[in-house]
């Protein structure tokens, strides 16, 4: 019961975050659809450079080792370590705001990837793609978990994570593989 004496549609889980106890609305599914779309775009941004190695090497004077560092280390290092920091912020703060900031960071970094003039600028741009994308999954799963009851949250989380595979497939198509 809430302060008004009416039954509350939200209850706190053991982490203190509210958990949904109501039937799902169309808006809840709209949120999942938007997170799915963001997941697709995020994964395209993440992997498409791997499919464009030859055109990038033709444009920029990069060695195989530098291409490997740009497509692997640059993204992964900040994705992994940033994910820990950003995940903690998401648990303590406003998930939608943090997700929005992460999307802006990785979108700007993706644009910077396209205008990079050499190894250093490309490496830095890919690092920022990694730090931006590090917040996507923790924020999205938290947002979905708040909107759906514990007994029904599996389907929307599965839909969200399916976006990774759809994005990977689209990256292959867009990258010409």
What are these regions (language model features)?
Residues 125-164:
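Cytoplasmic helix-loop-helix junction between adjacent transmembrane helices
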Residues 61, 94, 115-121, 132, ...:
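Helix-breaking motifs and short loop linkers at transmembrane-helix boundaries and internal kinks
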Residues 81-120:
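Conserved MFS/SLC helix-loop-helix module at the cytosolic interface between two early adjacent transmembrane helices
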Residues 53, 167-176:
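Small-residue (Gly/Pro/Ala) motifs that create kinks and tight helix-helix packing interfaces
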Residues 55, 84-88, 177:
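Membrane-interface helix termini in secondary transporters
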């Amino acid at each position: 019961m809430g302060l008004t004496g009416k039954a509350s549609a939200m209850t706190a889980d053991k982490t203190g975050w509210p958990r949904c106890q109501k039937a799902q609305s169309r808006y809840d599914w709209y949120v999942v659809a938007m997170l799915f779309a963001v997941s697709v775009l995020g994964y395209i941004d993440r992997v498409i450079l791997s499919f464009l190695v030859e055109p990038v090497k033709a444009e920029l004077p990069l060695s195989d080792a530098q291409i490997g560092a740009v497509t692997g280390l640059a993204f992964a290092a900040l994705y992994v370590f940033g994910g820990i920091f950003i995940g903690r912020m998401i648990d303590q703060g406003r998930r939608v705001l943090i997700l929005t900031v992460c999307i802006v960071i990785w979108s700007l970094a993706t644009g910077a990837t396209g205008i990079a003039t050499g190894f250093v600028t490309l490496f830095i741009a890919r690092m920022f793609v990694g730090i931006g994308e590090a917040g996507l999954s923790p924020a999205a799963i938290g947002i979905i978990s708040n909107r759906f009851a514990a007994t029904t949250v599996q389907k929307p989380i599965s839909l969200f994570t399916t976006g990774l595979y759809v994005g990977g497939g689209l990256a292959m198509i867009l990258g010409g593989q």
